Swiss-Prot record:
UniProt gene name: dmrta2
Start-end of Low complexity biased regions: 179-201, 223-235
Database matches in Pfam families: DM (PF00751), DMA (PF03474), DMRT5_DMB (PF20624)
Name under which the protein is recorded: Doublesex- and mab-3-related transcription factor A2
Location(s) in or outside the cell: Nucleus
Family statement drawn from the similarity comment of this UniProt entry: Belongs to the DMRT family.
GO BP of this protein: germ cell development; neurogenesis; regulation of transcription by RNA polymerase II; sex differentiation
GO molecular function, one term: RNA polymerase II cis-regulatory region sequence-specific DNA binding
Length: 437
């Protein structure tokens, strides 16, 4: 069989492409480079400037905030963006603070345990304070009615506001016969009726009547003359106002002169008024002055107005004690009787007076050193706290204005120095000059 065509060996091979064969191209050749692809993927997710977006411009936010064209724009959209940014910044700061506090609280719990760690965190301000039943629920749940009953006895009623304390009935007074069994009970325990229902109004009222402050008020209403100085001074005005609704009568009794008359019923009212005036209206200071006078011996002599303050000649008496802070002490010659804390004192002969003399009249026989450095600056002017017992009742002193230092020097200048300093205090030079005159 013959073939009509040339042999295959003689047919020239021409490079022809078969149309049925598919062409395969690698996918990496159709994509861009790896660097360009990464930039193309992340650029749409980079933060953009919101102000520029409001005005139709797209700009990356990194390094753009300072150079933004619309950073000071006050339009409605930009103002809303600024407010939203402020709120978001506050929320982020709060979340950071809460996360830090939680981490610190977690560390404290690991160190000290759960309850102690939360307590320390709340005490240091790391955690906001929670109610007691959340942290110490087991401790608070153990307390029963006994702790509630003791609550009314341990804490005074003056610490509880007036709105929380129940008002007493109008007919029942602290001094009425109905309240006598209650007041007769012990101060530290409430009445038997108040124990079963400690939270009721009856328990509050009876425990209020059984407090020591109300008992003092009841005794004060029955016998005001038998009140001691301690009981009259104890209890502030606020506590008495809380206990007794009739504050007008107590206000009249709390005046300084009334307090002094109740504390010292044996003293005259005029004397107490004068002492109070000299102390500048200070009740405590006036009581100290009177108590210091009463602590001396009752047998000592009293000073009269003419003999003590206005005598020109020196009056010698060994029974009197110094009324002036600048006066000399009695046993000045004996070293053993002097105190180690007493200041150095010159000889009494330089002043022409004895150790216990008082010249408060025309020329005043005072020690200038002791007068200048007075040890007692409170109370009456130049008055020592160790005055005689009869000094106050006899009114043996001048008004406080006469004790000014300028008046003392003025009275002293009216008298010649030879009458006061008989032994030549300032040496022969001054005395010779005086003799020449």
């Amino acid at each position: 069989m013959e073939l009509n065509g040339p042999p295959s060996s003689q047919v020239p091979h021409t490079p022809t492409c078969a149309p049925s064969l598919p062409i395969t191209v690698a996918g990496t050749l159709l994509r861009g480079p790896q660097l360009l692809l990464r930039a193309a993927e992340k650029y749409p997710r980079t933060p953009k400037c919101a102000r520029c977006r409001n005005h139709g411009v797209v700009s990356a936010l990194k390094g753009h905030k300072r150079y933004c064209r619309w950073k000071d724009c006050m339009c409605a959209k930009c103002t809303l963006i600024a407010e939203r940014q402020r709120v978001m910044a506050a929320q982020v700061a709060l979340r950071r603070q809460q996360a830090q506090e939680e981490n610190e609280a977690r560390e404290l719990q690991l160190l000290y345990g759960t309850a102690e760690g939360l307590a320390l965190a709340a005490a240091n301000g790391i955690l906001p304070p929670r109610p007691a039943y959340e942290v110490f629920g087991s401790l608070c749940g153990e307390g029963g009615t006994d702790s509630k009953i003791q609550k009314f006895d341990l804490f005074p009623k003056s610490l509880i506001p007036r709105s929380m304390t129940p008002q007493l009935p109008s007919g029942g007074k602290p001094g009425s016969p109905d309240s006598e069994p209650v007041s007769g009970s012990a101060p530290g325990a409430s009445s038997p009726e108040a124990q079963p229902g400690s939270g009721s109004e009856n328990g509050d009222g009876e425990s209020l009547l059984s407090s020591p402050i109300s008992k003092e008020l009841k005794e004060g209403e029955e016998s005001p003359s038998l009140i001691s100085p301690l009981s009259s001074e104890s209890g502030s005005d606020a506590e008495k106002d809380e206990q007794d609704p009739s504050s007008s009568s107590l206000a009249r009794q709390r005046t300084p002169i009334n307090i002094l008359t109740r504390v010292f019923p044996a003293q005259k009212r005029s004397v107490l008024e004068l002492v109070l005036q000299g102390c500048g209206g200070d009740v405590v200071q006036a009581i100290e002055q009177i108590l210091n006078n009463r602590s001396q011996d009752k047998g000592e002599g009293t000073w009269s107005k003419d003999g003590a303050l206005q005598s020109i000649q020196p009056s010698v008496s060994s029974t009197h004690r110094p009324l002036i802070a600048g006066a000399l002490t009695p046993a000045i010659g004996t070293i053993g009787s002097r105190s180690a804390f007493s200041p150095l004192q010159p000889n009494a002969a330089h002043f022409g007076t004895e150790a216990n003399t008082y010249q408060l009249g025309g020329h005043i026989g005072l020690n200038p050193l002791r007068l200048a450095y007075s040890a007692h600056s409170r109370g009456l002017a130049f008055m020592a706290p160790y005055s005689t017992a009869g000094f106050m009742p006899t009114l043996g002193f001048r008004p406080p204005m006469d004790y000014a230092f300028s008046d003392l020097m003025r009275d002293r200048a009216n008298v010649h120095k030879d009458q006061v300093y008989t032994n030549g205090l300032y040496g022969p030079v001054v005395n010779n000059n005086a003799e020449k005159q």
